[in-house]
UniProtKB/Swiss-Prot annotation:
Cofactor remark: Binds 1 zinc ion.
GO-annotated molecular function: metal ion binding; metalloendopeptidase activity
Lineage: Bacteria, Bacillati, Bacillota, Bacilli, Lactobacillales
Keyword match Acyltransferase: no
The family this protein is said to belong to: Belongs to the peptidase M3 family.
Described purpose of this protein according to its UniProt entry: Has oligopeptidase activity and degrades a variety of small bioactive peptides, including bradykinin, neurotensin, and peptide fragments of substance P and adrenocorticotropin. Also hydrolyzes the synthetic collagen-like substrate N-(3-[2-furyl]acryloyl)-Leu-Gly-Pro-Ala (FALGPA).
Protein name: Group B oligopeptidase PepB
Length: 601
């Protein structure tokens, strides 16, 4: 059973007192922020009174947004560390409600700004040079003009933001707080409570009985609740489609991608290119079956490492290795990594009620915190360098950009994290000459590629399909979702849905389906990271400098322009094809090692 949080050493818990020293200070800030937002209601109708009013109201909005983010970070992270604590559920609800109030109060901002003509805008810039620093901020709003409604309509929608977000919040509570999974046996024969945190480590077990039991226990539980999960997912899809439609977008995908100025062709190119290369995944599945010595490969066999090498890392060992590997970026990067590792930015271990998975979070005025659910595996070492990549991206951006540009597009976010993963792989393959160790590292890389490019593209294809289906009037019942997911899974892995009954329920446990066209960026990011990591490891100092400049750029330019400066053209399929070339090269090396019998040694 997962430990209670009180049993975990303080050094392995994130230090949220650096955000607010006490809960009482958080509550005081909520009261003051609520009053400040109320006071801002008088701005409505006055944004364009003068260049001075445009500057002042813009800066008040940004200041309140900055304070609100800090309030939300504290509440959400307190809740995430133990989702069963009612007090912090209430804190998160208050923070969410305050966001809705803020959005409603400033719903006048964009409609009023868009009444400004180009000539009047230029006059304002001449009168008030301080407005120049917000030029790109304004430019992005002007680009959105065809999709902004009247002030009353935007105010109405802003007031309903909690309703639109309710499906995702219901999913989180159901999945993290209410779901109870059976007791299963681990490889030692010990009975353990199945959790989100230990599921993957059980699926990585070399004991097929352990894998099968955990797999069936997990998905049979989701089977019991499939209709509830279908309703929450359907409601979320309907919300996204509705918001896109009323804002004059052709689809929810167009709406989501346009927020980051990403053309839909990037998404289509990803799915088309990955589908073209699915034979490589089928080939890897055949190799996996051969190495495992199985007559038939099942979905509960796709996570277990092919290597029997004991590449386990305690958390402290993983910290040391990560610092060694990431030193390649130079002193400035290394110094910030050390701070993250020693100043309690990270919440490390599994505990009862803790949110599953891993993430990097925080706001402009906080540390770039990380949530983990640590298991002593090579995969968790990769998770650590991945989340550190996010946190260092956030740190460099906040240090080098004003608040207005002090964040970055999610399209760019996954590049920073997976570049770190690929640098870890490149470094390990350069260091290791022994066949058995190379086998283990290659296996991990191929599994990571499978999980990041193939799997996330499968998710992206499913996500778009259900949005299109809803647009066309299809009711997203559990039966429909199960069938669609099973067919896609068979296409990707080449393993029949008849022989893998339980996998049809996997869609129910994927939180990213509530994030509105997020998952495709894991795949595009990993592919771009493949290219960047090779340049950083084998290139010249200018390549590293270009990469650090990308980390520092934040939202000061459009995402495709920012990453182009680092050397990647995301409008082309070339970066994807380059990634598949690396995958095939490493697959060939693994096939050759298998032919030599390395896996039997």
């Amino acid at each position: 059973m997962s430990d209670n949080r009180s049993h975990i050493e303080e050094k392995y818990q994130w230090d949220l007192t650096t955000v607010f020293a006490t809960d009482e200070l958080w509550e005081t800030e909520v009261v003051e922020l609520t009053q400040a937002i109320d006071n801002a209601k008088g701005f409505s109708g006055h944004l364009l009174d003068s260049s001075q009013s445009l500057l002042e109201i813009t800066e008040v909005e940004l200041d309140l947004s900055r304070r609100l983010e800090k309030v939300y970070v504290y509440a959400s992270m307190k809740n995430d560390q133990d989702t069963t604590v009612a007090k912090y559920q209430e804190f998160q609800a208050k923070a969410t409600a305050l966001y809705a109030k803020f959005s409603e109060t400033f719903s006048f901002y964009e409609p009023e700004l868009l009444q400004l003509s180009e000539s009047d805008y230029q006059s304002f810039l001449l009168e008030m040079p301080d407005l120049q620093k917000y030029d790109h901020f304004f430019e992005k709003i002007f680009a959105n003009k065809p999709h902004v409604l009247s002030q009353n309509e935007e105010e109405l929608l802003a007031g309903a933001s909690e309703i639109f977000g309710a499906a995702g919040e219901t999913f989180e509570i159901l999945d993290n707080a209410d779901m109870v999974f059976p007791v299963v046996k681990n490889a030692k024969g010990e009975e353990v409570e199945l959790t989100h945190g230990n599921f993957i480590s059980l699926m990585e077990s070399s004991d097929r009985t352990v894998r099968k039991e955990a797999y069936q226990a997990m998905y049979s539980t989701y089977e019991q609740f499939q209709h509830t999960y279908a309703k929450t997912l359907q409601t979320n899809v309907k919300s996204q489609n509705f918001k896109a439609r009323v804002h004059h977008y052709q689809s929810a995908r167009q709406s989501a991608l346009s927020a980051n100025f990403i053309p839909e062709e990037v998404y289509e190119t990803l799915i088309k290119t990955v589908n073209h290369h699915l034979p490589l995944l089928h080939r890897y599945m055949k190799l996996r079956q051969k190495v495992l010595g199985l007559d038939d490969l099942k979905m509960y066999d796709v996570y277990t490492p092919l290597s029997q090498m004991d590449m386990s890392f305690t958390y402290d060992e993983a910290l040391k290795k990560s610092e060694e590997v990431l030193a390649i970026f130079g002193e400035a990067y290394s110094e910030r990594v050390h701070r993250a590792f020693t100043e309690r930015w990270i919440d490390v271990h599994v505990n009862k009620g803790k949110r599953s998975g891993a993430y990097s979070g925080g706001s402009y005025d906080t540390n770039a915190f990380m949530l983990l659910n640590w298991q002593d595996t090579l995969d968790n070492l990769y998770t650590l360098v991945h989340e550190t990549g996010h946190s260092l991206h956030s740190t460099f951006t906040r240090e080098n950009q004003p608040y207005v540009y002090g964040d970055y597009s999610i399209f760019l976010a996954e590049i920073a994290s997976t570049t770190n993963e690929n640098i870890l792989t490149e470094t390990l393959l350069k260091e290791v000459k022994d066949d058995k160790n190379r086998f283990a590292i290659l296996n991990h890389y191929l599994d990571g590629f499978k999980g990041t490019i193939f799997r996330q593209t499968q998710f992206a294809e499913f996500e778009h399909a259900i949005h299109v289906a809803d647009q066309e009037g299809q009711v997203l019942t559990s039966e429909y979702l199960n069938n669609l997911y099973a067919e896609l899974n068979e296409k990707y892995y080449g393993l029949t849905k008849e022989d893998n009954h339980f996998i049809q329920y996997e869609w129910a446990r994927i939180p990213h389906f509530y994030y509105n066209y997020y998952v495709f960026q894991y795949a595009t990011g990993f592919a771009a990271a493949n290219y960047l990591a090779e340049r950083i490891v084998n290139g010249n100092p200018e390549d590293k400098e270009a990469y650090l400049n990308y980390l520092k750029a934040g939202n000061s330019d459009y995402p495709l322009n920012v990453i182009a400066k680092a050397g990647v053209d995301m409008t082309s399929a070339d970066y994807l094809d380059a990634a598949f070339r690396v995958f095939e090269e490493r697959l060939v090396e693994l096939e050759n090692l298998v032919a030599k019998g390395v896996h039997n040694d």
